[in-house]
Amino acid sequence: MTHGEPQEFSFDVEENHGHVPVLRARMAELIAPKVTAMGSDAVIIDGTLGAGGHSKYFLESFPEARVIGLDRDTNSLASARERLKEFGDRFLGIHTRFDRFAPKLEELAQSGNPIAATALEQGISGALFDLGVSSMQLDQAERGFAYRVDAPLDMRMDNTIGITAADVLNTYSHGELARILKTYGDERFAGKIASAIVREREKEPFDTSARLVELLYATIPAATRRTGGHPAKRTFQALRIEVNRELESLENVLPEITQRLTTGGRAVFMSYQSLEDKIVKRYFVDISTSKTPPGLPMELPEYAPKFKVVTRGAEKATDAEIEENPRAASVRVRAIEAL
C-alpha cells in the first residue's frame, strides 16, 4: 500500500465474497504460544467479532481456550452468537465499542461470569482486532456502507446510537467536510466535493447513497474517474471513519488491550488503510522502545520496554490468501507481546 492510499477492499457488495476470515491461520499462529501454554485459563479477545469467523477458528484451533467477542453492531453480535452456540460457555459475546470493553468485563466478572473473571485474574492470552467494515455489514445494503447499492446514508456500525453519514453531509461546515474527506479518504478533490455537497444540500438534504454517488461522478474530473477507481470509494471511507470514530477508537484501545495482556500474551492488529496502520505502528514502537536516558552505560530495569514487536514490519497476505479472500489484498498485520 502506498502512502495515504485508502482501503483497497471495495465498498461494492458485488466484489465481496462470503465471510472467510482474513488470514485466520496466521492469526491463530501469532497468538498460539501463550494461548496454548495457558490451557483452560486462556482467554482470547476477538475485538471485532463480525460474523464470528475468527472466533470460530480460534475455538476450534484451541479446544481449551475461551473467547470473548466484542462488537458494537447488534446484528453482527446476534448472528455470531447463533453461529457459535455449539461452543457453549466457551464463548462470550459483548455488545460494546471495542475500546470500551474493560468496564463491561468488570461488570460481568462482578456478576459471576467465569470467562470475564478469568480474563481479569489471569490476563488476556491473545487478542485480535480486524479493523474496518465487515463483510456482513457490506452485505446488508440498507446499512449504507456499499456505494453501488442505493440505500439510506447511515453507515453506523452500531445503528442504535450516534450520528449518521446523512447527518455529517447535511450539518458539517464546508471546512469540516473538506477536512474529513482529505484526512480520512486522502481525497485530492476534497474541497471541490465539499463545495458541491454544501451547494446541493441547500436544495434538498442528502438521505440516500445514490444521490451522493451521482454528485461525486459529476464533481470528480473524468480523467481521474478513469484511472482512480470508483469515484465514491474515498468519500465513503472518510464518512464511515467519521461516523464511527474509528481512529479515535483505535487510539483508545491500544493501551487498553496491551496493559491487560498476561506475560507472553499477544495482541494482533489487522489494518486496511494507512491511517490505521500508522497509529498501530507508532504505538507499538513507543511501548517496545527502551526509555533509558541517553548517555547511560547500561539499560536500567525501570526504563526497559515491557513489550516486544513480534512481526517484522507489517506482514502482508500471500497471493494464495488474496485469491481465497479478496479483502486480504490490502491488509497489514502487526503483533506485539507483553514481556
UniProtKB/Swiss-Prot annotation:
S-adenosyl-L-methionine binds at G52, G53, H54, D71, F98, D130, Q137. Its EC number is 2.1.1.199. Coiled coil: none annotated. It catalyses: cytidine(1402) in 16S rRNA + S-adenosyl-L-methionine = N(4)-methylcytidine(1402) in 16S rRNA + S-adenosyl-L-homocysteine + H(+). Its main location: cytoplasm. Disulfide bonds: none annotated. InterPro entries: RsmH (IPR002903), SAM-dep_MeTrfase_MraW_recog (IPR023397), SAM-dependent_MTases_sf (IPR029063). One of its GO terms (molecular function) is rRNA (cytosine-N4-)-methyltransferase activity. One of its GO terms (biological process) is rRNA base methylation. It is found in: Cytoplasm. Keywords: Cytoplasm, Methyltransferase, rRNA processing, S-adenosyl-L-methionine, Transferase. The keyword S-adenosyl-L-methionine applies. It comes from the Bacteria. GO terms for cellular component: cytoplasm. Specifically methylates the N4 position of cytidine in position 1402 (C1402) of 16S rRNA. Belongs to the methyltransferase superfamily. RsmH family. NCBIfam families: 16S rRNA (cytosine(1402)-N(4))-methyltransferase RsmH (TIGR00006). This is Ribosomal RNA small subunit methyltransferase H. It comes from Corynebacterium diphtheriae (strain ATCC 700971 / NCTC 13129 / Biotype gravis). The gene is rsmH.
